[in-house]
Amino acid sequence: MKSPEAEVFRDSISTVTQDGKRAWIFPKKPSGRYYNWRKIVSYFLLTILFISPFIKINGNQFIMINVLERRFNIFGQPFWPQDFHLVVISMLIGVLFVVFFTVAYGRIFCGWICPQTIFMEMVFRRIEYWIEGDRGKQIRLKKAPWNAEKIKKRVIKWIVFFIISFLIANVFLAYLIGSDQLLKYMIDGPKYHLSTFISLLIFTAVFYFVFAWFREQVCVIACPYGRLQGVLLDNKSIVVAYDYKRGEKEKGRAKFKKSENREASGKGDCIDCAQCVHVCPTGIDIRNGTQLECVNCTACIDACDSMMEKVGLPKGLIRYASEENIEKKTKFEFTPRLKGYSVVLGVLIAVLVGMLFLRNDIEARILRLPGQLYEHKEGSNISNVFTYKLVNKTTQNIEDVSFKLLSHDGFIKVVNDEVNVPAQELAEGTLFIEIDSNLLKEEKDKVEIGIYSGSHLIETTTTTFLGPRSFN
């Protein structure tokens, strides 16, 4: 059974032709109230993105995700693999936030905050307008033969795109290996850091491919967030929507005619100018309703408002609204489902904040040496050998470290007399614990150990002490 002509858009995407070839999108340069606000938000976020790797707090990079060395800085606070439980909680909160936010506000994130949209629409697209001109000029340039003008414009655009992609790749690398290390590599030159330079070129090629060729296909094909809409959106979700009740009315949309009483004639307020289609960065017609390709960028809102103002009709034909708002002309309602998500999200955030505040400055792990049994000492004393690992999560050296038994009478002998843990480093070694066997209750006893810096207790940990089966 074939779909009606009006429903064809539901069975295909706007960026692919009927014969399966790429349909290049040439959106008209947007302008308007929402676009101006998006520029402010976008350039603010871009500024944060580009300067964050070079900001230091207490000697720590503001944000660093060094997977190779397993060192992470979030807002200037160092995190280690031992803090992985915090990452799990954060990811869980992030997933729930995406669900909660999408249920309530659709893909507003995509249009306002997503790095792909910001770079594509506020950086690369604006460069394209500057070099090649607006929609009409770009279409004519694409159809034109490869003459001197076309070669000149395309080469200039490709060079500028490559330079910006290279710059983005450098910033991306600064997040991965640290800005200090990146600057050192740049001063030394690629000759001495060939693997890093090759990685930089690979990142550059990926960014260039995404923004020069793949472009809006990322949002339409590659990004899983768009696919979630079908599961998460309902008729109460706020999206960029066309008010079909007002736009169509009894006789549907029609071209604008001066001095015509559209209300009396039963014509809708939509004058079928197609400006909302021409300005769309993914090439859809928002009048067909919510679609997979829509990133809620508001370009169609600005274009429609501009046309409504010119023809003397009320603005808001395309606006932020839900299906229920348009159908029943009601206001946004905080549904029980949203309330449930909010409660769960609030609890998880409270747990995460609590765990961050209770996070210790030092991580201690003391484990019995594998394959080693206990050893009899003088009198009734039993000795076990252990390995210790101390991770200093702070920017200060921890000096004069000592170990003391808190749960049993006995003593601890460290192989190295002096233990110091440098800032953001770890210290490892061996120690012996000696306890009177008469104090042991089981074959394997839990013992509590205190780690001190001078006389100050900085951490406690437990380990298993092995003794004989009989204590008589």
Task: Label every PLM stretch briefly.
Residues K2-K249, I301, P314-G346:
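Membrane-embedded alpha-helical bundles of multi-pass integral membrane proteins
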Residues T102-T117, F211-G226, N261-M308:
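Cysteine-centered iron-sulfur cluster-binding motifs in ferredoxin-type domains/subunits
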Residues A350-Y374:
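Hydrophobic alpha-helical transmembrane segments in integral membrane proteins
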Residues N381-T387, E428, E442-V447:
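Short, solvent-exposed loop/turn segments enriched in Ser/Thr/Gly
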Residues L390-T394:
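Asparagine-centered strand-capping/turn motif at beta-strand->loop junctions
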Residues T395-G410:
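Short acidic, flexible loop segments centered on an aromatic residue
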Residues K413-N438:
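Intrinsically disordered, low-complexity Pro/Gly/Ser/Thr-rich segments with frequent PxxP/GP/PP motifs
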Residues D436-N472:
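Terminal connector regions
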